[in-house]
Amino acid sequence: MAQHAVYFPDAFLTQMREAMPSTLSFDEFISACQRPLRRSIRINTLKISVADFLALIAPYGWSLTPIPWCHEGFWIERDDEEALPLGSTAEHLSGLFYIQEASSMLPVAALFADDNHPQRVMDMAAAPGSKTTQIAARMGNRGAILANEFSASRVKVLHANISRCGIANTALTHFDGRVFGAALPEMFDAILLDAPCSGEGVVRKDPDALKNWSPESNLDIAATQRELLDSAFHALRPGGTLVYSTCTLNRQENEAVCLWLKETYADAVEFLPLGDLFPDADRALTPEGFLHVFPQIYDCEGFFVARLRKMSSLPAMPAPGYKVGAFPFTPLKGREALHVTQAANAVGLLWDENLHLWQRDKEVWLFPAEIESLIGKVRFSRLGIKLAESHNKGYRWQHEATIALACPTHAHAFELSAQEAEEWYRGRDIYPQTPPAADDVLVTFQHQPLGLAKRIGARIKNSYPRELVRDGKLFTGNS
């Protein structure tokens, strides 16, 4: 594989020589950093099983190599990447897989290790959504996930990925993660803190990642990480599991941050060893039981993962100084709720008791029941999924609800050809040879929902959201 020129500050190389265990070769580390990163994907099991996905893509000639720590994860090699980017394939557009670096699948694997089944989870630094969507798949879209992102510009991307993957059990917030320990004390069964870091492990993807690196910045970042971890630990219930991870390699931002928590809270912190997380995990195992993944070990990005359990309750942090404000939604119950449910079921939108109906003016939403106890304690950017807007003639069903809730075997489902599906993604109306009989149509391709539409005569009127419409070459090879 071709090498690329990576910028390494001398002080960084000195630090890595000190941090790297004697069992690893420093020359192999440098060589691995200069190799381009292997591409990898994670199959979205909310929409398709691993076996069915592999059967679906078998004719394409893709070469898939299993990732040891994620049953749904594969390294991928394709001959047609230049002709058709992976993100423009039909399977990606319909949310059947997520393009995700292999190392970044490790934290969620650790979070659910040892048959852990949390019902309320927080992803404290969630964008762009790879780990949130992985958590949702492991939870089977049940329970609830609070997905927080501090960067306002990245919240929109986070929501887009959650929506594409058909996820219904999330609430989005936009806060500095340091508020949650005070705002939501001991409210979560499990928390993932994939902390902001110096990014030393990503040089295979970005050869200039270390251009602004300095030992001093590592220490500044570690101070922020300690505050975030402290907040996360306070938000975790006693007995709950917390995973701390970074995509960096120095000990100050990794082992030292976790050891600081242990020194601060002593017996309240138990480190849970990760040596049995997957075969060969012991090659990256630290004496504390963490995984310190140098890129040459598994031929992936550099990464760090620690898992711990909260053994006892902690004194509360000072109350947050912000005001939440009035909650603008009211529960929808009784006859009204029944009417909405029956109307939704009639067009193929189905849900269970894990989701509850709420209303704001003419909008109807579905909130995960597990998140309702947090209402009034924190301000949400977006909660659950928007199901519909009511109007005089009924309901205007929303695209994100269709992707998350539609039953592709419903009587109104209408399977498109590849050419028709591509036209759909381009925002164009469909003119099938044999139009559907029903006026309300659940449009599908590869038996996956693409949207709800109206049949007008022989034409299916396109309802694909304008902001999602695609141009350029798509999966049939036509521009």
Curated annotation (Swiss-Prot):
Compartments, record wording: Cytoplasm
Binding site for S-adenosyl-L-methionine: A125, A126, A127, P128, G129, S130, K131, E149, D176, D194
Keyword tRNA-binding: no
Residues making up the signal peptide according to the UniProt record: none
Pfam families referenced in this protein's UniProt entry, alphabetically: Methyltr_RsmB-F (PF01189), Methyltr_RsmF_N (PF17125), Methyltranf_PUA (PF13636), YebU_pre-PUA_dom (PF21150)
CDD domains in UniProt: AdoMet_MTases (cd02440)
Matches recorded under PANTHER family: 28S RRNA (CYTOSINE(4447)-C(5))-METHYLTRANSFERASE-RELATED, NOP2 YEAST -RELATED NOL1/NOP2/FMU SUN DOMAIN-CONTAINING
Stored HAMAP family: 16SrRNA_methyltr_F
Name of this chain's protein: Ribosomal RNA small subunit methyltransferase F
Species this chain originates from: Salmonella schwarzengrund (strain CVM19633)
Taxonomy of the source species: Bacteria, Pseudomonadati, Pseudomonadota, Gammaproteobacteria, Enterobacterales
